[in-house]
Amino acid sequence: MEEKFVLHSPFAPSGDQPEAIKALVDGIDEKKEHQVLLGVTGSGKTFTIANVIAQLNRPSLIISHNKTLASQLYSELKALFPDNRVEYFVSYFDFYKPEAYIPKSDLYIEKTSKNNKELEAMRMSAINALSIRKDTIVVASVAAIYGESNPKHYRQNFFPIEVGMQIDRKSLLLKLSQIGYERNRMELNKGQFDVKGDSIEICPGYVSDTNIRIDMFGNEIEAITLIDPLSKNVEGSRKNMTLFPATTYTVHENTIQNTVDLIKQELSERIEYFKSHDKLLEAQRIKDRTLNDLDSLLEFGYTSGIENYSRYLDGRAPGQRPYTLFDYLPDDSVIFIDESHLMIPQLHGMHNGDRARKLSLVEYGFRLPSALDNRPLRFEEFAEFKFPKIYISATPGDYELDLTHGEIVTQYIRPTGLLDPIIEIHSRDNQIEDIYDHLKEQIAKKERTLILTTTKKNAEELSLFLQEKKIKSAYIHDRFKIFERNEILKGLRMGKFDVVVGINLLKEGIDLPEVSLICVLNADSTGLMRDTRSLIQIVGRAARNDHGKVIFYANEITSSMRECIEDNLFKRKIQSEYNEKHNIIPKTIVKPIAPPIQNGILSEDHSKYYGEKDLSQMKHNKKFIDQMVRKMTQLAKANKFEEAIEIRDYLIEIGIELDK
């Protein structure tokens, strides 16, 4: 049966969307390698892309510049394509501090990290889906350019099974162990299996709502059943299926032995190099550290920092680029680069920073030179992938515009009929008093405000000044963690704050329809956040409200301001003429306030336990409550009392009565 994308939406494309969809689809059909979609804020670019994917019916990868935006895109596309595979691929670390050495202070910093098992499982689901299904969309962060296992090796570990298959139980269990599954007789977690009589129950290492039970009759598979992990109720059956590996880093014994031999050879050469340069400390250091790693590899098949030997494990030549998510994409895939004006510079910068850190480790004997091949893609390596690419932004960068020779697909009309905000220019003299007067008007109308300063100090001082004036104010800067920033912006939407002050509020990626006024202090100053693209992005923040307004505080009109204002007037003219022609009355976007986003998954602070859920319904979900109680009990038994208390407090908060 052909796997087709089926888009579910009560709305049809409107405004500029039909023309944009047609232009992009035609461009792909015409073999255009690069296209740019210039869509204003709130014009429904995600819906346009969803329609393009549905019409092309080709596997698609959407890359976003941060986990927050990636999570939003994932949620939106999952709702639009409930019958297809929509997957999520971001870093699986909740916390990560890389290994480093600082020569000036002779300080070695060991790698410390905390893995998120749910995100790890979601990554595996993404590469599994790309391997077997054409109707797959993957939403990824910059993690897409970091190393993954060799796709050839990974797919060799796929284990197809079917009813009637001749295989004895011992061979079946051995095969499960070879693809990374561990036996657990007590309680199954991801990547584990248990055997009871003639039945083998498997908890997949990837995202799955069910466990898999294989029933044997002698040396034959008699039945393959999908069962609920808790109740053990049968959810379905299969005549055949593919068991995917429990982890992406499943390594066979012969590969490990070959890897160890090659590492020993490089180690010998490196020791000789250090000795010939009279660096005896470095020679001894690299010898001790590497041999310790090799002992672990031989005994356990794993060592801390195993990624530094990925070149050997993957079978790559020195200097060969790493395997990444792109190597799992089918040949007819399409790549969408969201917020390309931010994503492209991010892709440019990742390799150099990584290499600079590792060079010190290699130079001072903490790592072998082959560790330099454990790296993200260089930008030119990313650019060499010949998949058609669509760059999406309200302010495309020079790179993507050069690739298309300035040709763009535009989307200026919003389905809501909203116009770009009015821009006013006020004097910088007495700008604080002027802002205070406007804030009083805003509060009277129960509308929200953003204020953009040029320094952290100014943001903090202005916020404190407003608080002294009894205005509910908060400030944001880059020392705040992502979920802290999102909590403040959620508070702004809910009315906990009347105004939020910050320097760069563009990277949040969160819609704020309640914001009808944006005040830009020192708009005529020079710098990154007052260039033309940044000013256009700032103006767009007030474009979700039917009487949005932006005030530039300036004593002169800079070229960036002039270009922004001209762009604003041009768009407003197109939008107002369209509204007049079609009798459309602009209307503020009404958007529900979603739970805060932490670690890239829509959830409350307890996301590490219960993943992405409609929290308002959780109290009535018996299966979910049972899972939480069970998890709480497990954590308590493992003496992880703080985490157990978190779950207990959450359950009490949503009204669940717990037995003592």
Swiss-Prot record:
GO terms for cellular component: cytoplasm; excinuclease repair complex. Its main location: cytoplasm. GO terms for molecular function: ATP binding; ATP hydrolysis activity; DNA binding; excinuclease ABC activity; helicase activity. Residues 26-196 form the Helicase ATP-binding domain. The keyword Cytoplasm applies. It is found in: Cytoplasm. One of its GO terms (biological process) is SOS response. ATP binds at G39, V40, T41, G42, S43, G44, K45, T46. Residues 622-657 form the UVR domain. It comes from the Bacteria. A motif (Beta-hairpin) lies at residues 92-115. Coiled coil: none annotated. Keywords: ATP-binding, Cytoplasm, DNA damage, DNA excision, DNA repair, Excision nuclease, Helicase, Hydrolase, Nucleotide-binding, SOS response. SUPFAM superfamilies: C-terminal UvrC-binding domain of UvrB, P-loop containing nucleoside triphosphate hydrolases. Residues 431-593 form the Helicase C-terminal domain. The UvrABC repair system catalyzes the recognition and processing of DNA lesions. A damage recognition complex composed of 2 UvrA and 2 UvrB subunits scans DNA for abnormalities. Upon binding of the UvrA(2)B(2) complex to a putative damaged site, the DNA wraps around one UvrB monomer. DNA wrap is dependent on ATP binding by UvrB and probably causes local melting of the DNA helix, facilitating insertion of UvrB beta-hairpin between the DNA strands. Then UvrB probes one DNA strand for the presence of a lesion. PANTHER family: UVRABC SYSTEM PROTEIN B (PTHR24029:SF0). Belongs to the UvrB family. The beta-hairpin motif is involved in DNA binding. Forms a heterotetramer with UvrA during the search for lesions. Interacts with UvrC in an incision complex. This is UvrABC system protein B.
